[in-house]
Amino acid sequence: MFKPFGFAAETGSHLLTTQWLQLGNSLCLKERISIAMQVTFLAFFLIHLALKWFGVVRNRGSNDVEEDLKKQSITVKQSFSYNISLLCSVSILGTHCFILLLLFRDSVVSRCDSSVSVFSAEVSQSFSWLFVSVVVVKIRERRLVKFPWMLRSWWLCSFILSFSFDAHFITAKHEPLEFQDYADLTGLLASLFLLAVSIRGKTGFHLLESSGNTEPLLLGDQTEQNKKDSYSSSSPYGNATLFQRITFSWINPLFSLGYKRPLEKDDVPDIDVKDSARFCSHAFDQKLKTTKEKEGPGNAFFYNSVLRYVWRKAAINAVFAVVNASTAYIGPYLINDFVEFLSEKQSQSLNHGYLLALGFLTAKIVETVTQRQWIFGARQLGLRLRAALISHIYQKGLVLSSQSRQSHTSGEIINYMSVDVQRITDFIWYVNNIWMLPIQIFSAIYILQKHLGLGALAALVTTLMVMACNYPLTRLQRNYQSDIMNAKDDRMKATSEILKNMKILKLQAWDNQFLNKVKTLRKKEYDCLWKSLRLQAFTTFILWGAPSLISVVTFVTCMLMGVKLTAGAVLSALATFQMLQSPIFGLPDLLSALVQSKVSADRIASYLQQSETQKDAVEYCSKDHTELSVEIENGAFSWEPESSRPTLDDIELKVKSGMKVAVCGAVGSGKSSLLSSILGEIQKLKGTVRVSGKQAYVPQSPWILSGTIRDNILFGSMYESEKYERTVKACALIKDFELFSNGDLTEIGERGINMSGGQKQRIQIARAVYQNADIYLLDDPFSAVDAHTGRELFEDCLMGILKDKTVLYVTHQVEFLPAADLILVMQNGRVMQAGKFEELLKQNIGFEVLVGAHNEALDSILSIEKSSRNFKEGSKDDTASIAESLQTHCDSEHNISTENKKKEAKLVQDEETEKGVIGKEVYLAYLTTVKGGLLVPFIILAQSCFQMLQIASNYWMAWTAPPTAESIPKLGMGRILLVYALLAAGSSLCVLARTILVAIGGLSTAETFFSRMLCSIFRAPMSFFDSTPTGRILNRASTDQSVLDLEMAVKLGWCAFSIIQIVGTIFVMSQVAWQVCVIFIPVAVACVFYQRYYTPTARELSRMSGVERAPILHHFAESLAGATTIRAFDQRDRFISSNLVLIDSHSRPWFHVASAMEWLSFRLNLLSHFVFAFSLVLLVTLPEGVINPSIAGLGVTYGLSLNVLQATVIWNICNAENKMISVERILQYSKIPSEAPLVIDGHRPLDNWPNVGSIVFRDLQVRYAEHFPAVLKNITCEFPGGKKIGVVGRTGSGKSTLIQALFRIVEPSQGTIVIDNVDITKIGLHDLRSRLGIIPQDPALFDGTIRLNLDPLAQYTDHEIWEAIDKCQLGDVIRAKDERLDATVVENGENWSVGQRQLVCLGRVLLKKSNILVLDEATASVDSATDGVIQKIINQEFKDRTVVTIAHRIHTVIESDLVLVLSDGRIAEFDSPAKLLQREDSFFSKLIKEYSLRSNHFAGSNDLLS
């Protein structure tokens, strides 16, 4: 009992001192802490107020007018946050004032027996809350956008004080409740609301201007804030109130729309500005820069940058997580009191039971709110970090040096973006478990100590021992994860390279070889995955068995120490052990996530520290200060700085503005490297490079972006019709545009796959011209176009529209040299000669060799022409008529002629996405892949046995334990604990069986799916690769496959496990009170409704998220390939902005998927709380004796986890369905229509086929797709065996398509092709392609060695390989390398020149020695001298074999036995060169005449050379 306070009677200083000495009494502890806190707060507040007043006095009058104008034009619209904070503050103030009135009337309002303490506490509280209320009112007048930090700190401290003391006294004491208890409960609820407001921080004010526009109230930088607010104006989350954010009701409109119809991309709202990629990237960039300045390079700076970037949001999440972890243990803490209440119901008031039920319910609601907020906050933070990391990985990719690009291939970098970033952001979700874990453990130990005494020490020791076991397991898992990522990198690297060069593999019949290569790499990855999953299964067995082990050890210790195990104590302990399951069960996932994120973070940190292109390699000068456009002094450059021989040495170059500089030389002499030195792409070892003016660059290998032709030409510039028309005319593109279905708006496939080499070259030349640069660097711009088009480009573009510009152009075609102001002759990385054309010829040092080779070719043409007819020199009119005649033969690669203009055709098809519910066949396909689904029932059986044994063990302890300390147990404690231990051990073994079965089934299924998808992709026709971006395929091979490898089986397993668990929980609760089933039925119906209401929206959002991920990878792959061009055009910022837009496009559906999940979980949790509260009220209300208190306590124990289980069931089902989309996507690529069989048994050709080499085309018609017009039309002709056939025609006339039809890359839609009396459509593709040889137009080398690229099937000896290398003029180059045949070839052969790559391809056919050889522009990238040598070698090696040559160089085909002229996809002419030249009106004759006229000014060079 407590004494009356009697303030009137207690007087005198002695009495006052005595009262203050009594503050040590524990009943007055709250009052003592409260007084200290209020005094501290008031002191700080007064000091702060004084400082503010002093500042106002000093600045008085400076801003009075401005503030008055603001107040006159702006009115404030109050928000929910502000109103509730004011209401709560005033209500708490009123409560304390009322208590003061009661104290003056000598009323007993508290348990504290010190009247001075109580009075002082209430006075200080009243003053404090009075100040708080005044401050809140003043906030409105001051129009603050955020509550002051001091006020928010006070609200936080008040909540902690109320929660720590009030909740304890209300629930733990069994005396009648005082008025103070009810007042404290009211204050606790009000403090809870104020806590939420303080965490959010914002007042939510909106200002209403005189114009009527409503804008958020701003502080500081008004402009920047306005930008943010306008960005988030369309974001429901950004505009949501506090209540909407707590309940996630801001997403309701999206659910309403998604329930009515499938969502489209435009239906998804924008994300908040702070979640946007631009904001996140900028913020993270600031952290990186400041951290790197302080700490220098190393992985540590990356970790610290990430920490500084996330810490604010992470700290808020941590507060929610800590409160969540604390409130979760209130239930187990109260179970003993509840069992005692049920056991002694007659002596207890029902109010006390209801109050206990209210305590349970309040704790569960707080737990739900805080849990949902920290989980959502973690996902939101993960989204922000993902955006920041992807952005920086992309930005780094644009500036990587050549050495860094060699060590980090596209496949590896794509892995960083798709897998490593995902693992790091996933860890953000787990990171709160790090500080939740100790709180959960020590809360559990505290509860155990309260009920079991020193037995709790055994629980603590056992728990720490179990966790200590994880240390070696974690280290081992980390090694496995590192191995997995390295193996995945190797697989993705190979896959990316293969997809880019799939056409080469099919032409060479190497697809099976490279398929086996990927399978071998996958086998290595599979072995690493199996080791990891096997270890994870063992770890799960240990940790899932840990709660049972801890409970057995604890109970045995209690028995040995004589601690009485009553039913209440046992049930409280069991509930605590059950709560411990969450942190201990989650420990493997936490450790796995920690290990995976550590490995991934190290990889990204290492990547971000790779060397970049030299920023000081080039000095940029103003055009006003120098007459030189380009200047190099004493320059030395190298692609491999560590090499003893620089790539370029002793470079001296001065180029005046407006000069035309030609660069020529043999293959590998350093021509392209010279241009790279001007661009700053190659490492500068010494010297100075100065550039004055804007640059434009045209690379040797065309780089074309997916999109329209116009987009590629504009390249980010504004469209100006006159300028655009001049550009396309100068680049000879007008005819192509006229013949395309959509003109210049025709869509280009990935890497310009649907364009000829000449068209791609002219498009990128037009891109450079349109930029109106000062300096143009053109790397072999004429090699891919025919002679007529080359002349047009040179005259109209180089010498026409660019006549006043500075142009440096690399060329092998000597006819373009005389017009140059300066010619540079390169040899072995040095400028051996420099001067005008005539000057160089007179020097007789080496230039005459190049010119001589050209003249020899020209002489051969002239001699054939003269032998056919008397050659007459044409006049200017003749030249004009020839050009006009040639123009009439214009066509495009796909021959989309004018009559087909109306036929619209989209090359790159939109990604196929399913709509609506994921079909049952997808689930069945996944579940029945391994052994017809035989493992599934065994997995479910193992989990069912685990659940039954768990329930049996808990039921056994509840039934056998005595209800009170005085009761006699039904059995001896030794027997009780022995049975319990056996049941617990059995349940642990079931867990082991389940985890192993899930690991085996999941990984085997993933492997089967991967094999099917891989084989399906390799067997797909080329049309699939033409219309499918590489990034889209890689997305399935990386991200989706990773889901199948590590997540899918676990997610589906948890669906079954959680359903089994909730069925067990309902069973136990119904055993206690069957009436629970009555309320559970409608609640279950409501849950099902919510799930069905949620699923359509979440499913479509997940699909969108998966689809929107691929464009990020595709854009990145394209940007990496064209990084040099992007830097040369100074377009980095534009491409970075495009990347940020793509990230936001993916973040929008992803963010709303996460929000939708929390929306559902919040509502399901509330429904489960309703069931639990109903159960508690029912147990309190039922008369004594109706139920066994121990069994009732067991029901409450299980009921505590009902909310988690109920939400887990729906959450797991929805999450599994979202993950099942990856299965659906992989299944799509497992059913790609296949090309023809590789081998057809019964229709195999003879081993020596083709022995003659005759090729007959009969009424051949080819189209690339059903919706495309015909490309080749009615081709009928015969190539006799052993003859040399030349195929000519203007760029895009269908020459390459004819070759593709010959190799069946594209199947004939009509007609046949017969080789040596064998219809090629009747035999297998490998039997056809392996017997033919080809040197393709685009030379491709694979990552590896020279030996691997020449002989990938390992069929030839070193002697044979060296013989082929010498013949293709690469012997000296390869012998100069230390590794020789094992010399390194990096991705795409980037460390070899284009000409050298083409020579390697020549070496392949020399080794193969096929009876039919196809040369598709085989020597386009080599100089005339080398071309002449190669032609002689081919004539010698294949003199009795059929050689089909496609070439733009006339001398290459002039000596052919027959010439086929194609025009408009039809045969224009087909005869011997001599007969065609006899006809003056023949296309071939006019082509020769035009070439002769263009080269006529070389006639005098023979005299100079003689």
Swiss-Prot record:
Keyword set includes Flavoprotein: no
Spans traversing the lipid bilayer: 37-57, 84-104, 116-136, 150-170, 179-199, 315-335, 350-370, 427-447, 452-472, 541-561, 567-587, 934-956, 976-996, 1048-1068, 1167-1187, 1191-1211
Localization: Membrane
SMART domains: AAA
Residues involved in ATP 1 binding: G665, A666, V667, G668, S669, G670, K671, S672
Keywords, ordered alphabetically: ATP-binding, Membrane, Nucleotide-binding, Repeat, Translocase, Transmembrane, Transmembrane helix, Transport
ABC transporter domain sequence ranges: 630-853, 1257-1489
GO biological process terms on file: response to nematode
Topological category with respect to the lipid bilayer: Multi-pass membrane protein
GO MF, one example: ABC-type xenobiotic transporter activity
Short name of one Pfam family: ABC_membrane
Catalytic activity: ATP + H2O + xenobioticSide 1 = ADP + phosphate + xenobioticSide 2
Tissue expression profile of the protein: Ubiquitous.
Family recorded in the similarity comment: Belongs to the ABC transporter superfamily. ABCC family. Conjugate transporter (TC 3.A.1.208) subfamily.
Protein name per the record: ABC transporter C family member 9
Taxonomic classification: Eukaryota, Viridiplantae, Streptophyta, Embryophyta, Tracheophyta
